[in-house]
Structure formats: structure tokens, C-alpha cells
Design a protein with these regions (language model features):
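N-terminal pre-catalytic segment of deacetylase/amide-hydrolase enzymes
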Residues: 124, 129, 137, 170, ...
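Metal-dependent polysaccharide deacetylase catalytic core of the NodB/CE4 family, i.e.
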Residues: 200-225, 262-266, 280, 286-385, ...
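Bacterial N-terminal signal peptides
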Residues: 7-16
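C-terminal domain-boundary segment and adjacent tail
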Residues: 226-259, 368, 389, 393-427, ...
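Positively charged n-region of N-terminal signal peptides that target proteins for export
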Residues: 1-6
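Boundary regions of SH3-family modules and the immediately adjacent low-complexity/disordered segments
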Residues: 22-38, 64, 85-127, 174-210
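Beta-loop motif signature
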Residues: 24-80, 118-177, 213
């Protein structure tokens, strides 16, 4: 059975409907089955408007409505589908609705309007991505920097889309409009800044210890102990508001421009590998269909699950870690480096490069028994310098997170990524602004960490 069926054709200029995500079914190729490096060289056009599908995060979903009689590059049909460039990856169009185009690189469609394609030489290079935009509604893509020009497609809501450049142009009334230049099907298109929001980064939230208020006697004054009530409210807000929880591997793809992600996206991280996270966070995340990265101090994994004792910091056992892998992406928080020196400074600062590398490699060997893909590191107590960064790179990691506060933005250094702390005392309205694409960054200062 085909997923993409013939549907009522909606006029491109008045498209306002929404399209729900579709599940994986036989006949739809997975991302891994496509050769994403295969060049797209054939110019095509649609005979009628059609929905474009693409992987956004982990989901295959509708991403755009492609207007008819608009040229773009597409692959020859592979099975039931053509493949065209969409954002950082590819999209899929049902075969049978394309016809070969007979266009040159620049084709007149009106006396004063032109269709422009990325040149062959440009397609062979890493065309630079300037930034991302976020769609909050169904958004027209124009053939020129003018709302009177023809629409080539409708970009659907809740998408992050790469931007090639910005241009300011006056409209007929003399108002200055900021235009985003993008590429779809290796064709240049233009989106008005009035229709979208600039992407201000992906929030990576940090948690450590979770307790019920009634059992928290020893950690009331540590910022990194979160009440179960507040944590539940925060996770339920993310679910109800439609946020997709990302792996840090997807965050890396956002930075290296290799994946497409939704506009409402957040990454959850838990440092240390405490039993309270397994007791309270794991079942809630599992129920909500959410996932997180768990940074484990590998030398502190317990052979047996300890009897619950909320007055102390208890670490997860092998059994707890194994049984929670459906939610947690288990990564390294070091083996023996999670300590402070006599001056109360992270001990990583006083260790030589080879010592740090050996520690991280040992941690990776241990954690590969739980997760063979070891690629991310959380600096103990957030302590890092260039020597630590070089050691993380040398150990084979591809990214690392700090305790510096802020969102992850395009261009950020992958071995010094920022995160955010949400406190138990934060009203849910503040939490919403913290994770949202808010113009003013919301952070909590003076964080007191559990020792």
C-alpha cells in the first residue's frame, strides 16, 4: 500500500491546511537506504501540486507543498519515489507526477521574472549555510524577493530550514523587508522574514538529581536537585507543546548541516548517572515517548541496585542502565576524573593530556558494554580548557557539553556546547520561554552543583 495517495489539489496561493506525520511503511525507503551523496542532475517539473515528504528528526512527515509548473532538480524514480534536495538532506515525491523539463539554468516565465537554479559548479561544492529559520505556520516560498512573484512551494509549519543569505528589499510601499534566500530542489527561493522566525538555537537542558519534596532533606539548597513535581510539569509541558526530544547526535547534525530538525526541539541531558534519575525520570520519559542523554561516571556503576536511600547520592547499577536504554543514550562523564582537587577545582585542570585521554578511553571501554556508539562527553563539573578539549578529540569523541549556559547555535564549537538549567522554582511560563525560540535568552545564574 502506498502511503502517499492522490488527494484534493489545493490552490498553492491559498493553502492553509495542515498535514499530519505519516508512519514508516513498506515501500518508503529509510534514510539509510538512500544514497544521499548521489548527484541530482535532471531538471523536472510537477504537472499538479503535490506533497513533499522528508525525514525531520526521526519522523517521515509532510514538509512542503510543491507547486506545479515550477522547475527543480530531481532524481529519476527509484521505486515509487523521486528524490529532491530538501533543507540539509532529501525529500521524497511520489512518482507519476513529474515530467522532464526542458529548461536552461535561467528560464523566463514572465517578461520580468526568472527562475534561478544553483549552478552545476555550486552544486558540487559545500554551499554555505548562513543560518536557520523556523516556520511557525505554513509559509510561502517565492520565486523572487517579491510577494507578487509566483510561489514555488509552501513550506509547512514547525520546521528548521537552512538559509543561504539575507537580503533587504523595499516593497511597493517603500517598506523594507528582510528576505531569506533558501534552496529547495536545488532551486533558489525566497521567504519573507515577516512569515518566519530566525532560529535562536536548540536548548539542551541539564538535570542531575530528582527527588520528591517530602524526601529531600539533604539537597534542598543545591540547584541541581530538581523536585519530582517540577520535573513532571516541565516534561509534560514539552510533550503537550509538541517538542521533539533530540539525541546529541542529532544536535551534531544540526551543527554540521546534515539533518533536518523540527522547529520545536529540545535535548535532555542527565549528568552523573544517579539512581534517582532511573527511579523518577526514566518512567516518566518512557510514558511520554521522550528520550535523553545520560552521562555516566563509569567507575561508579554499581554491581547491584542499591536499596533506595534519598538522603545520599546513589548511582545506577548495571541492571538499571541496561533496562533504561530505550530512553537513555548512555555516554561518558569520565571514569576517575569526576573529582575536585584540594583547591576545590575540577581535577581535570591539573591532569596532563595523556592522563585525560587514558581516563576517557577507559570510560568508553566500560560504557560500550551498554552502548557501542560512544561519541559525546560531559566535562566533570563543567571544567574544561584547551588541553581538555584536545584530549576529548584525541579519545575519539565528536562533541562535548559544558555547564556554560545558553542554547546551541549554528557555528558553536562542538567540543564546548552550552546547556541550560531549569530550576524547581521556575514557573512553567519561564520554562516555556527558556526552551522556546524567545528573542531574549532565559538563563538561571549562580547554579549550586551537587558534590
Amino acid at each position: 500500500m502506498r502511503i502517499i495517495t492522490n488527494s484534493l489539489i489545493i490552490l498553492c496561493f491559498i493553502f492553509t491546511g495542515s498535514v499530519s506525520a505519516v508512519p514508516y511503511e513498506r515501500g518508503i525507503p529509510t534514510e539509510a537506504q538512500w544514497d544521499l551523496k548521489k548527484p541530482i542532475t535532471t531538471l523536472m517539473q510537477l504537472r499538479q501540486q503535490k506533497t513533499l515528504y522528508a525525514f525531520v528528526g526521526d519522523k517521515l512527515r509532510p514538509v512542503a507543498e510543491i507547486c506545479p509548473n515550477q522547475g527543480f532538480y530531481a532524481s529519476a524514480a527509484e521505486g515509487d519515489y523521486h528524490k529532491i534536495q530538501f533543507g540539509n538532506a532529501q525529500g521524497y515525491l511520489e512518482a507519476g507526477y513529474l515530467e522532464d523539463g526542458y529548461f536552461e539554468d535561467i528560464v523566463s516565465i514572465k517578461p520580468d521574472k526568472k527562475i534561478r537554479f544553483l549552478s552545476d559548479s555550486t552544486k558540487k561544492t559545500d554551499y554555505p549555510i548562513y543560518e536557520y529559520l523556523i516556520t511557525t505556520k505554513n509559509t510561502p516560498i517565492y520565486s523572487d524577493k517579491d510577494t507578487a512573484s509566483s510561489q514555488i512551494a509552501i513550506l509547512l509549519s514547525n520546521l528548521r530550514y537552512p538559509v543561504l543569505s539575507r537580503t533587504i528589499k523595499e516593497d511597493a510601499d517603500g517598506n523594507k523587508i528582510n528576505w531569506f534566500e533558501i534552496s529547495l530542489g536545488d532551486r533558489l527561493g525566497y521567504i519573507s522574514s515577516r512569515d518566519v522566525k530566525p532560529d535562536l538555537g536548540i536548548p539542551v537542558l541539564t538535570y542531575h538529581h530528582i527527588l520528591k519534596a517530602t524526601e529531600n532533606h539533604n539537597f534542598r539548597h543545591t540547584s541541581t536537585t530538581t523536585s519530582l513535581t517540577a520535573f513532571t510539569e516541565q516534561m509534560n509541558y514539552l510533550k503537550d507543546a509538541g517538542y521533539e526530544t533530540l539525541s546529541l547526535n542529532q544536535v551534531a547534525g544540526y551543527l554540521n548541516k546534515s539533518v533536518n530538525l523540527p522547529g520545536r526541539a529540545v535535548a535532555l541531558t542527565f549528568d552523573d548517572g544517579l539512581q534517582s534519575v532511573y527511579r523518577y525520570a526514566y518512567p516518566l520519559l518512557q510514558e511520554n515517548g521522550q528520550r535523553a542523554t545520560l552521562f555516566v561516571i563509569s567507575s561508579r556503576i554499581k554491581s547491584k541496585t542499591p536499596k533506595w536511600a534519598p538522603n545520599s547520592l546513589q548511582f545506577m547499577s548495571w541492571q538499571s542502565l541496561k533496562s533504561s536504554r530505550d530512553v537513555f543514550d548512555i555516554q561518558s562523564h569520565s571514569h576517575f576524573l569526576h573529582r575536585l582537587d584540594n583547591n576545590k577545582k575540577p581535577i581535570i585542570f591539573s591532569r596532563q593530556s595523556h592522563t585525560i585521554i587514558l581516563d576517557l578511553q577507559r570510560s568508553q571501554r566500560v560504557l560500550r558494554l551498554l552502548n557501542p556508539h560512544q561519541y559525546a562527553f560531559a566535562y566533570p563539573f563543567g571544567g574544561y580548557n584547551q588541553r581538555a578539549i584536545n584530549a576529548v578529540k584525541a579519545s575519539g569523541m565528536t562533541l562535548a557539553v559544558t555547564t556554560q549556559q545558553g542554547k546551541v547555535r549554528l557555528g558553536d564549537p562542538p567540543f564546548a556546547l552550552k546547556r541550560l538549567y531549569a530550576l524547581s522554582t521556575d514557573p512553567i511560563e519561564k520554562f516555556a520561554r527558556m526552551v522556546g525560540n524567545d528573542e531574549y535568552e532565559v538563563v538561571n545564574k549562580n547554579i549550586v552543583v551537587d558534590k
